[in-house]
Every structure is written in structure tokens, then in C-alpha cells.
A protein has these predicted regions:
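Trp/Gly-enriched beta-strand/coil motifs that build multi-repeat beta-propeller-like domains
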Residues: 1-194
């Protein structure tokens, strides 16, 4: 709802989704039932049109993903089917080019990772295949060098973690092996105060 406080989407035992608008104290200010989606799951959230309100991507088995561009009230402003993506899996949503709009990394059935730079209409402005990552596992994203562009940590087949600082065009500015972490597992990609 663009108030600067993250909301929460819950799935109840009856498979209905409920959106909680949160306040700074940690309790809900109001709730909204997201109807007619009992067989769908939330696969990504982010501000996919740059209006300051978080949006939702839904998917159910065998279906095309459905993008909801949201209003501040928690109602749907525009619903868009993301065509030809029934077999694609989203791995991350973040602003990978510092334009104020959340972008999406997808994994295709051929194991290629594709970065979608999103535009204000809620569709991809440009796409980029992230080369040579077929056997790598996406692990985390965050702005690890404070340049306004989100970066990526991958886990390679040899269990080494690779930190990739991204440029605005989706290319890797710097790749850095995070040494001595082959037997470690990432627990949380954000810590308190960040």
C-alpha cells in the first residue's frame, strides 16, 4: 500500500490467500481476502511497474504466470498473463538496473537463467540470458556493494559460492569466489538493520 511498511500474504488451511497491511509495531492495520486463487501460489513479489506499490506474480501447476499490478488498497489494478512461461521458474525479483522497477530472474527448462528488465507497463523491457550458469544454483540477491544495483550469489557445482556484482545492463562487473564456504549453507540473505 506504499506506506513504507512491508505487508504479508498468508495462505490459510482452506487455501485462500489473505493480505495483511502491516504497521510499524508489527501488527496488521487491515486485511484483505485475495479471492478466487485457491489453487494458485505466490511465486514473486516486487514493484513491477515502478508506482511504489508491491505487485504479485501468481502461478498454478501447468499454467502461465499471472501478474497482478496492485493498487494501494490491495485491489488489483491490472492483471496480465505472462505468456509462454508455464514451464519457467522465477528465482528472484529485485531492481537489477537501478531504475526503480523490480526485475525478474527466471530459470527456463533448458536450465538457462534469463533476466527480465521490467518496464512501467508490467512487462519485460529487455531480456538477457545469463550465460554459462546452467549448472549453477541461485542462492541470494542483495546490493552487496551499495551501488544501487542488486547483485547475485550463486552456488557452483563444486559447492563454491560466487558473488557477482552486476552492471546496469545485467552483465557481471566483478565475480568473486567467497572462499572457504564450500561446506556452508546460506541461511538468510539479510541481517538486522539492513
Amino acid at each position: 500500500n506504499s506506506d513504507g511498511v512491508s505487508g504479508v500474504i498468508w495462505k490459510r488451511p482452506d487455501n485462500k490467500h489473505v493480505l495483511w497491511f502491516m504497521k510499524k509495531t508489527g501488527s496488521a492495520t487491515s486485511t484483505r481476502l485475495l479471492t478466487a486463487l485457491t489453487t494458485w501460489n505466490v511465486i514473486a513479489t516486487g514493484d513491477f511497474n515502478g508506482d511504489g506499490v508491491s505487485d504479485i506474480i501468481w502461478k498454478r501447476p501447468g499454467s502461465q504466470p499471472l501478474l497482478w499490478l496492485m493498487n494501494k488498497t490491495g485491489t488489483v489494478k491490472i492483471a496480465k498473463v505472462l505468456t509462454a512461461l508455464a514451464t519457467w521458474t522465477p528465482y528472484a525479483s529485485a531492481d537489477f538496473n537501478d531504475d526503480g522497477i523490480s526485475d525478474i530472474i527466471w530459470k527456463r527448462p533448458d536450465n538457462k537463467h534469463v533476466l527480465w528488465f521490467m518496464k512501467k507497463t508490467g512487462g519485460p523491457k529487455t531480456t538477457k540470458v545469463l550465460a554459462a550458469l546452467d549448472t549453477w544454483v541461485f542462492t541470494a540477491t542483495g546490493d552487496f556493494n551499495a551501488d544501487g544495483i542488486f547483485d547475485i550469489i550463486w552456488k557452483k557445482p563444486d559447492n563454491k559460492y560466487l558473488l557477482c556484482f552486476l552492471n546496469e545492463d545485467g552483465t557481471f562487473a566483478v565475480k568473486k569466489i567467497l572462499a572457504a564456504l564450500a561446506t556452508w549453507n546460506l541461511v538468510k540473505d539479510k541481517v538486522a538493520g539492513e
